[in-house]
């Protein structure tokens, strides 16, 4: 295979990509905008008093995954009790919703209150993964108890709650 010299080097910041010129020429000929809103400043972009509303519930995500594997080999009289507590997520989400409601009612300026509430809800994303693997081999008369309590989710949302209270006190 024969190598050929390149006129463009990716690591050289002064070297223009060969397709840049072709794409710029293509855009000049194809792009014609007759939009009164974006080009002439007669719409949302030209209005300094415009308020962009966002969907408040779009980023309120809670995800918990538990994967537990218990392998018992060549054993007898084994008692296994496994508890997985994930109900705390819905309680914590309700707590976060209460904080957002308190934020909306405590800030006098409606626009600022909505922006703070949107920011709080956009930061409410919790993810927790718990994997356990337990191997019991050549054993007799063993009692095993596993408890999976997703406390990290509670701590994460408690931090969001403290930040929300701090923001409310700074704004007021």
UniProtKB/Swiss-Prot annotation:
InterPro entries: Spore_coat_X/V. Pfam families: Coat_X. GO terms for biological process: sporulation resulting in formation of a cellular spore. This is Spore coat protein X. One of its GO terms (cellular component) is spore wall. Signal peptide: none annotated. The lineage of its organism: Bacteria, Bacillati, Bacillota, Bacilli, Bacillales. It is found in: Spore coat. Keywords: Sporulation.
């Amino acid at each position: 295979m024969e190598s050929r010299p390149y006129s463009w080097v990716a690591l050289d910041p002064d070297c223009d990509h060969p397709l840049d010129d072709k794409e710029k020429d293509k855009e000049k000929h194809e792009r014609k905008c007759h939009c009164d809103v974006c080009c002439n400043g007669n719409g949302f972009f030209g209005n300094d008093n415009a308020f962009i509303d966002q969907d408040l519930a779009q980023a309120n995500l809670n995800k918990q995954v538990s994967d537990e594997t218990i392998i018992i080999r060549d054993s007898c009289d084994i008692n296994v009790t496994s508890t997985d507590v994930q109900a705390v997520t819905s309680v914590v989400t309700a707590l976060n919703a209460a904080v957002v409601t308190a934020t909306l009612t405590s800030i006098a300026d409606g626009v600022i209150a909505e922006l703070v509430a949107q920011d709080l809800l956009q930061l409410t994303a919790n993810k927790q993964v718990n994997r356990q693997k337990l191997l019991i081999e050549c054993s007799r008369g063993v009692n095993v108890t596993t408890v999976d309590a997703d406390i990290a989710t509670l701590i994460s949302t408690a931090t969001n709650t403290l930040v929300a209270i701090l923001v409310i006190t700074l704004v007021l």
